């Protein structure tokens, strides 16, 4: 089959991306740095039937989207995020499920000199199995070691690389010698496009419990502010009523003014012992009962002693 010319290929690509944008209401803008062709093929296979992965040149993707803005103006929100090595993952399924599938397709990778670290790298305390001739190599990296049974032992965990730092040649060599693959590469979700709205992928981690907690925090903040400035709202009115009742009660206690609910408080302040008089009665009644038990056991002890005195032993 003859290979299609470049003009035909571009035309088909534009038609494909426009059709995907029309057919799928949701998509991820994903970064594809350090993702090889074999890994990309595995990702496509794992998403088959649930999502479609589309990669391409940024200029072509922008051109296709700009040409389709008349039919779907909301697509303009995607344009600022098409930069770097990015692509799209289109889906009609639950976004969290597709996100988890992308994360599951990350593969471990060794550290390479010159690469930017996507995460912190810590070398754990361990016996490296390396000979003493490598001691100077560890010292150059500031790693405390000792010789144990003819091999180098790292005494404590060491943070070797920080997120965003460039991996040096020495760090990469050490990690390779220790057979540590600190990084994992795959499609990284940069933005989420959902029915015309675009937002950060961290929003996918928000649960109903999180929303409920944040809502209650907001209600408490509103109530606090409204109470301070004296502005009544649904959130602050219950607190205002309680505070008002406390003030009226305080006035009633200090004056001759009274009302049914205040009378009980006044009675308590006048004679607090009247409200706790029943408590000692329980203790007092319980004490004689406890004392009566030994009294009943006393005759039994006397009878046992008398049996022994009479000589009725066990072997008689």
Swiss-Prot record:
InterPro entries assigned to the protein according to its UniProt record, in alphabetical order: Ribosomal_protein_uL10, Ribosomal_uL10, Ribosomal_uL10-like_insert, Ribosomal_uL10-like_insert_sf, Ribosomal_uL10-like_sf, uL10_eukaryotes
Gene3D superfamilies: 3.30.70.1730, 3.90.105.20
Record keywords, A-Z: Cytoplasm, Nucleus, Phosphoprotein, Ribonucleoprotein, Ribosomal protein
Single biological process term from Gene Ontology: ribosome biogenesis
GO cellular component: cytosolic large ribosomal subunit; nucleus
Role this protein plays: Ribosomal protein P0 is the functional equivalent of E.coli protein L10.
Protein name: Large ribosomal subunit protein uL10
């Amino acid at each position: 089959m003859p290979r299609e010319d470049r003009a035909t290929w571009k035309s088909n690509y534009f038609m494909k991306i426009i059709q995907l944008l029309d057919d799928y209401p949701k998509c991820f803008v994903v970064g594809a740095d350090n993702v090889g062709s074999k890994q990309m093929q595995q990702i496509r296979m794992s998403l088959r039937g649930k999502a479609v992965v589309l990669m391409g040149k940024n200029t072509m993707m922008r051109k296709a989207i700009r040409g389709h803005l008349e039919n779907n103006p909301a697509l303009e929100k995607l344009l600022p995020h098409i930069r770097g090595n990015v692509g799209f993952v289109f889906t009609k399924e639950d976004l969290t499920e597709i996100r988890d599938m992308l994360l599951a397709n990350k593969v471990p990778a060794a550290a390479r000199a010159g690469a930017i670290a996507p995460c912190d790298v810590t070398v754990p305390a361990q016996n490296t199995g390396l000979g003493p001739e490598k001691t100077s190599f560890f010292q150059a990296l500031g790693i405390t070691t000792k010789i144990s049974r003819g091999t180098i032992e790292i005494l404590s965990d060491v943070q070797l690389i920080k997120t965003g730092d460039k991996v040096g040649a020495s760090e990469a060599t050490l990690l390779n010698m220790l057979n540590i693959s600190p990084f994992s590469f795959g499609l990284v979700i940069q933005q989420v496009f959902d029915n015309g709205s675009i937002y950060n992928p961290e929003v996918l981690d928000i649960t109903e419990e999180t929303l409920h907690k944040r809502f209650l925090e907001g209600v408490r903040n509103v109530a606090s502010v409204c109470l301070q400035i004296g502005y009544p709202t649904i959130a602050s009115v219950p607190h205002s009523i309680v505070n008002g009742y406390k003030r009226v009660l305080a006035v009633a206690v200090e004056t001759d003014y009274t009302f049914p609910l205040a009378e009980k408080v006044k009675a308590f302040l006048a004679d607090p012992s009247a409200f706790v008089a029943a408590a000692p009665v329980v203790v007092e009644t319980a004490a004689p009962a406890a004392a009566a038990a030994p009294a009943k056991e006393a005759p039994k002890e006397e009878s046992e002693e008398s049996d022994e005195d009479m000589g009725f032993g066990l072997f008689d």
